[in-house]
Amino acid sequence: PDSVRLRDYSPINVEAGRKLIAERGLQDTVTFDEVNAYDRTNYQDLQPRPTLGIVSGLHELFADNDLILNSLYGFGDAIETGGYLIYTGQPWHPQLEMIARALTSHKAGSPNWVMRRRSQREMDQLVEKAGFEKIRQWIDEYGIFTVSLAVKK
């Protein structure tokens, strides 16, 4: 690729990612920035414009579909027509309670969080609302994890 842009809200993750980029000598191609993925303005005026966006594990963190749409609209604003969005889903999980107690970093350490499950249909509708058309989906043998590919209309 000509360029790769990585983004995360956690300064710890960004610092670790930048270290790996430097260790591998990829600074001329790869950048890693600390941003809020749910703020649509963080997707504006990206240069070069992305032709591919990947969002993984982000949309399960919060129940509010408006936050999810802000993220997806941002991808829709940024990605060129004919470009692609790869997104993940978790329609269900047998260990929701354990995950909720173990993964608390995004909720200021609060144990009072449970992953927001969205049906595949709901997730696909949100992606479509943001200007993409789903063209392919893969799912694991247990029906827990999905990966979908959509094209920008």
Feature names for model-found ranges:
Residues 50-66:
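A short SAM/SAH-binding and catalytic strip from SAM-dependent methyltransferases
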Residues 38, 42-53:
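A short acidic, Gly/Pro-enriched loop at the edge of an enzyme's catalytic core
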Residues 1-39:
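Class I SAM-dependent methyltransferase SAM/SAH-binding core
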Residues 98-125:
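Conserved Class I S-adenosyl-L-methionine
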Residues 81-90:
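Conserved beta-strand signature within the Rossmann-like core of class I S-adenosyl-L-methionine
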